[in-house]
Amino acid sequence: DGEFEIYTKLTAGQPFKFVSSNTGSPVEYSLSGEKVVEKGTSTVTKTGIYKYYIDFNIGAFTTKEVTKVNLFLNWSQRKIELPYKGFGIWELTNHTITGLSGNDNNDDRYKFRMESSKGETEWRAINNDSKPTGNDAYYYMVEKTNVEQWTNNQIWKNPSTTGWNDKTYDIMFSLNPKNEYTHNLVIK
């Protein structure tokens, strides 16, 4: 315990703070230089989506601005951008994929790529590359720094269909701290 991570939208010049609890009389914290300190507020100079990782045990933090989250189709290397909706959730609804054929269309594997002020990372399944199990945990995500077309931990579309092309999807990618980091891909 004592560690916290959040993805959130912040507005330039608008004060924000972190609190130790959502109930009772929480301790308030702000950022000063490279440290987490009690009381006060912090601001960002640019409106954007930010990730903050805070270690209250040692009073330290890291941050990055998240500029884009994409669904990444492995074989075709197609990137489909997901707009940020709020509360650590990126979502694209009623999106029809077109223009794929052959192997570009037929391979069911995918993952997510995140672009940020610290570079590009991938979000993939916690377990090794395998077909869906029907268990919610199959869709839990972890961030990886090795960004390549073929890696372990790709996710497989479920149900498997005859390609991605000419189908409509709802795609949700959630890094909301209240739940496991997960995603959902619905074929309509």
Q: What does each model-identified segment do?
A:
Residues 1-188:
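Insoluble glucan recognition modules
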